[in-house]
A protein has these predicted regions:
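Rossmann-fold NAD(P) dinucleotide-binding segment
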Residues: 78-170
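Conserved beta-strand segments of alpha/beta enzyme cores
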Residues: 45, 73, 145, 170, ...
Length: 341
């Protein structure tokens, strides 16, 4: 399925990378992979598919252009995006992770053949669409490697892996353990999966600089991510809940300054700013993530009182933000809180 085909006139095989979920993470990783590839004279091309609430086929011109800026050519279906891909990243909302993984498995298991009879060409796309120089991490004839970046449950990860095993693909459970826009290709990644899949991830040399191999089965990295979320999302939720009440009581500055002081001066100020504003932007996705956290904790025999509360709080914030424009990145936490009404 992964074809690792050579561009005509070039000794370097083309690595085709697909992003199912063509959002901010995909664009940052595509830019990083391309930069790493360019430094070594290798060839890569990118495809993407997105089915978000706002950005889905038929894509708006500005969304196509946004992805094109990092070399991603958008496809209209999952099957077109992953056809012939050597590496597939899955990065969607937590509650769509399992269904997306199964769709990828179905597409890879079936294969898509274009009019010329070549598996992996997106209809209407040339061999160089979205290409930048990158190398032969694409092993001719090798099974495609699917890298699941989703903050979903270990159970969902195992279900997806089983489907991909049946489809003949290799699978890596890769959990993002910090903020991608801040750390970019240096973001901490925990990975788990079968040894041959982990070896393929390492051999691909995509340019990630902070990878921790847990040397464990798929589902372990996602468990680490979920349990980290128990702390981080509950912390975000408690900050926003407290600050909203403080704003209504007319003492937002008093409460915020006290919290920041406890977190320790400038680091605390930056942390609190990021947590509060980040929640406004990603409440819906994080509510779905915390639904998975509640399920995981209960499966482990731990009562999920705090996580359930954080889930419900995030869902409420998502509803409040539904018809509101998020504040600008440079806005203060107070402005973000007031924007909720």
């Amino acid at each position: 399925m992964g074809n690792g085909s050579e561009e005509s006139g070039s000794a370097a095989p083309t690595l085709t990378v697909a992003f199912v979920g063509a959002g901010e993470v995909a664009r940052i990783f595509a830019a990083g992979i391309a930069a790493h590839a360019g430094a070594t004279g290798r060839i890569v091309r990118f495809r993407g598919f997105n089915a978000g609430r706002r950005n889905r086929p038929p894509y708006a011109a500005d969304f196509r252009e946004l992805n094109a800026q990092t070399g991603i050519t958008l496809a209209d279906t999952v099957a077109e995006a992953v056809a012939g891909a050597d590496i597939v990243f899955s990065s969607v909302v937590a509650d769509q992770a399992e269904s997306t993984g199964l769709a990828i498995a179905e597409a890879l298991g079936t294969g898509v053949v274009d009019e010329a009879g070549v598996a992996g060409s997106v209809s209407g796309a040339s061999a160089t669409d979205g290409a930048s120089t990158m190398d032969g991490a694409a092993n001719s004839g090798a099974a495609p490697l699917v890298i699941d970046l989703n903050a979903t449950t270990p159970e969902a990860i195992r279900t997806v892996k089983a489907a991909l095993d049946t489809a003949g693909a290799r699978f890596v459970d890769a959990s993002i353990m910090d903020t991608v826009p801040v750390f970019r290709m240096g973001v901490p990644l925990c990975i788990s999966g079968d040894p041959e899949a982990i070896a393929a991830f390492t051999a691909a040399d995509l340019g990630f600089t902070n990878v921790r191999d847990l040397q464990a089965e798929a589902g372990t990295a996602s468990t680490a991510k979920v349990l980290r979320s128990v702390v981080m999302k509950a912390l975000e939720a408690s900050l926003v809940e407290s600050f909203r009440a403080a704003e209504k009581a007319g003492i937002l500055d008093v409460v915020a300054d006290s919290v920041v002081a406890t977190f320790d001066d400038m680091l605390g100020r930056t942390l609190v700013d990021d947590l509060v504003k980040s929640e406004m932007l990603h409440a819906r996705r994080r509510a779905a993530e915390m639904e998975g956290a509640v399920s995981t904790l209960e499966d482990l025999g731990v009562s999920a009182f705090v996580s359930a509360g954080a889930r419900d709080h995030l869902a409420h914030i998502a509803e409040l933000m539904h018809d509101r424009t998020p504040v600008a990145p440079e806005a203060t936490p107070a402005e973000a809180i007031r924007n909720l009404g």
